[in-house]
Amino acid sequence: MITKQSSNALRKKRHLRLRKIVSGTSQRPRLNVFRSNKFLYVQIIDDTKQTTLCSANSKEANVWGSNIKAAEAVGALIAKKALSQGIKNVVFDRSGYFYHGKIKALADACRKSGLHF
């Protein structure tokens, strides 16, 4: 019997395909996004040193939830933290999520706040 894979399993497959291509360096670290049912989490990662340079989430941005307003607030917050550490250029890793809705709002807010990708 043919069974349908869950959407999260398909997302993980897409994420693994993307991770073969996308990697962060010290000059251009990776902006990683994780979307749970309740919150949004964003990290800026240097893959060569395997360290997290800075992070933000929707709990920290005082906008509880995982909607578009929260995504915009988290995007502005992570851009502010990155620019304070001298990070201007990043590689956007959408973690297999479609570039639509919350993910697009987060990316647009990061760009509007001064990050380049």
Swiss-Prot record:
InterPro entries: Ribosomal_uL18_bac-type (IPR004389), Ribosomal_uL18_bac/euk (IPR005484). GO terms for biological process: translation. GO terms for cellular component: cytosolic large ribosomal subunit. Keywords: Ribonucleoprotein, Ribosomal protein, RNA-binding, rRNA-binding. The keyword GTP-binding does not apply. Gene3D superfamilies: 3.30.420.100. GO terms for molecular function: 5S rRNA binding; structural constituent of ribosome. This is one of the proteins that bind and probably mediate the attachment of the 5S RNA into the large ribosomal subunit, where it forms part of the central protuberance. Belongs to the universal ribosomal protein uL18 family. Part of the 50S ribosomal subunit; part of the 5S rRNA/L5/L18/L25 subcomplex. Contacts the 5S and 23S rRNAs. PANTHER family: 39S RIBOSOMAL PROTEIN L18, MITOCHONDRIAL (PTHR12899), LARGE RIBOSOMAL SUBUNIT PROTEIN UL18M (PTHR12899:SF3). This is Large ribosomal subunit protein uL18. It comes from Aster yellows witches'-broom phytoplasma (strain AYWB).
